[in-house]
Amino acid sequence: MQTLGKTLNMPLYRGLSNGRPESNRSDAKATLGPCGLFQCFLRPFRVAGSARLSRQMLALLVVAVALPAQAGLAIQSWTAKSGTRVLFVESRSISMLDVAVDFDAGGRRAPAGKAGLAGLTNGMLALGSTGLTESQIADQFADTGAQRGARADQDRSAITLRTLSSSAEREAALALLATLLQNPSFPEEALNREKARAIAGLKEAETRPAAIADRAFSRAMYRSHPYGASASAESVASISRADIVAFYQANFSARSAVVSMIGDISRSQAEAIAEQLTAGLPAGVAPAVLPPVGVPDPSPIRIAHPATQSHILLGMPAMARGDADFFALTVGNYILGGGGFVSRLMNEVREKRGLAYSVYSYFAPLKEAGPFQIGLQTRKEQANEALKLVQGVVADYVAKGPTAAELKAAKDNLAGGFALRIDNSRKILDNLAVIGFYGLPLDYLDQWVANVERVSLADVKSALARRVKPAEFAVVVVGAPE
């Protein structure tokens, strides 16, 4: 189960969105804090009494693997009367409906000193509404057999819903979701409980080298930019109910929202659902223009820790969502450190020298320049050697680019595995949300393989030269050799 991510505002969205292979995500930074409000994945079912509802819940559980891989997705898009952008895929293969409502209400929108506010606000939406207690909300979702989820990253906050598409269950689940989105009560008692839970998790995380490294790396990479802010026990403790109400009123508006849907409904039904979910949202305010992402602090950060291994992170802000270099960098990263055992870093660091069990690299594009990150763990006495080796491998790769054989293997693997990235409704929903929120072309998924196959050696080399500058890398070593 996904835990409290990068201290309430880590990137929790998955799928093909960042060009990083699903099979190489052992480094996912889901390490800080207890399970609870801020988990990416949907809450488990509460047990319902009737055999009919039990069968409905079984259908919900199997739907994630029952949808065949699809080619040529017919994505429909329009703007609702409320001003919300809507993306919809009609899918009649299973009697289900998946919905996501994404808001421009990620961690970057939190005021200075209030890191964690975005995730806390998002999670609190389901803990009380006008005329409904937390327990009543949970019971009503259980009665319909629906699943509700919450997720957040630096850019977005979202609520998700999975329900049967039959009229009674669908209408009840959507009515409840609309109530949560439009009339949250943010009860003080629930807020205090969730703050205490989060603070306990954050304090525990402060003892773990992976969490310490992640926080220090974000700060070194983004300095004072909002992307570099990580929640702390102090920042969460400072969040009041008034802060949450103000953040909700300012950022959870129809004009900042994107509604994504896939399922067994018609276009006209989808239009009505989008209006139902967004018509009563706050008016919101025009989002503040964020400062540009600057150059990282290149001074290596070495933090003592009693752990037997050193945790090493290095990288820099590199690429925004929709960047023209995305596909060249996706292919290039697969060769460098995204391809598991066939990557250069794995070959040099693990296979040839045995300095680490695993080493990875990835790009995570955001609204502004998202991180390019390399990570590994190694024994303390080997940390300096491993870091120097990684820096050398990256510098050589950026200078010379890949070989023709590496390029072909990477493109074949990425193109051949693409179908697995959209083989169920949940994955498709995640990608619809990415397309809608970041304004990507509607044929983005249809053209993904062709765009990968179009990448040349020159494309990779020139993109790396523009986006990956080893001399500017932020470097963090936790558990540094003494």
PLM regions and their residue ranges:
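Short, low-complexity, charge-dense intrinsically disordered segments
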Residues: 8, 17-22, 26-46, 51-54
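Cleavable N-terminal signal peptides
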Residues: 57-59, 69
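N-terminal signal peptide c-region/cleavage motif recognized by signal peptidases
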Residues: 64-68
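N- or domain-start disorder-to-order transition segments that initiate the globular core
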Residues: 71-95
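M16 family metallopeptidases and their MPP-like homologs
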Residues: 89, 94-122, 134-179, 195, ...
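An aromatic/glycine/proline-enriched structural segment found at the starts
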Residues: 227-228, 254, 258-322, 477-482
